[in-house]
Amino acid sequence: MAALIAENFRFLSLFFKSKDVMIFNGLVALGTVGSQELFSVVAFHCPCSPARNYLYGLTAIGVPALALFLIGVILNNHTWNLVAECQYRRAKNCSAAPNFLLLSSILGRAAVAPVTWSVISLLRGEAYVCALSEFVDPSSLTAGDKGFPPAHATEVLARFPCGEGPANLSSFREEVSRRLKYESQLFGWLLIGVVAILVFLTKCLKHYCSPLSYRQEAYWAQYRTNEDQLFQRTAEVHSRVLAANNVRRFFGFVALNKDDEELVAKFPVEGTQPRPQWNAITGVYLYRENQGLPLYSRLHKWAQGLTGNGTAPDNVEMALLTA
């Protein structure tokens, strides 16, 4: 029984590691949904005033989406790889296809949160109703045999999102709210459909155009994940041991806890890596092969003692990025 449970946990661990991007996007979407719900309850208050409603409603949908998009761009490692590529190599080693591929990857991942925010805002309908209530055509509103009074129609319609207005026009208020929520939710579902189709077509096109097999692409993604994790962990230990050595040289001793003492004793650090080495392993990386053997990262390429762009006649460069 214990062996079966352990095997199931191992399977789940491998599954989640292989789907880390999908899971991360899902967590981002869930976090955005929670933030949107909290915003609607706590911070959203329609001004119910002509001209102000429109600006407030659009701002409530657009500004948070823009902020989430910029945060997504900032938190994407590919963004800073592209910046480093432009800084150190002026992007001269990348053709238009890889640059377009990299930008698409950055923008696609950054769009998860803002699209989720926009969809939830439209499905709830509050911001849309607030923004467009004053623009409803009064002549199109009827309640039984009565029509909407044209006098001060804009001012009255602008107050409907707050549940205000003359008591004898309450039936019109419900009609306006129902009509605008219908439009808002329709746009929300259409946006979901368009995004789903685009994601599906992008995934199909990516795998169709890739010269690598599905298994090799999965291996490449696993390699990059493991390399990043090991590099970060090793860099943390290296910097800690180096800092301990420098503090000891300055004071003549260093106050270490038991774990730090074990690190210093187990991993002696004599020096640091020169800047050219850091530059060599930093930047945009495409899939490359050297004499038929794959090079899965800039660090892998550097470890093989290869320099330059790796596009000699016996080498192959492909416009591919890891997932």
Swiss-Prot record:
The record marks N168 as: Not N-glycosylated. GO terms for cellular component: plasma membrane. Its main location: membrane. Homo-undecamer. Two undecameric hemichannels can assemble in a head-to-head manner to form a gap junction. It is a multi-pass membrane protein. Inhibited by divalent cations such as Co(2+) and Ni(2+). Residues 214-251 are annotated as: Intersubunit interaction. Residues 145-152 are annotated as: Hemichannel docking. Changing L103A: Does not affect ATP release. Keywords: Cell membrane, Disulfide bond, Ion channel, Ion transport, Membrane, Transmembrane, Transmembrane helix, Transport. The gene is Calhm2. Residues 14-39 are annotated as: Central pore. Residues 1-21, 77-101, 207-323 are cytoplasmic. This is Calcium homeostasis modulator protein 2. It catalyses: ATP(in) = ATP(out). It comes from Mus musculus (Mouse). One of its GO terms (biological process) is regulation of synaptic plasticity. Neuron, astrocyte, and microglia. Changing S105A: Does not affect ATP release. Disruption phenotype: Deficiency causes dendritic spine loss associated with neuronal dysfunction. In a mouse model of Alzheimer's disease (5xFAD), it confers resistance to neuroinflammation and related cognitive impairments. It comes from the Eukaryota.
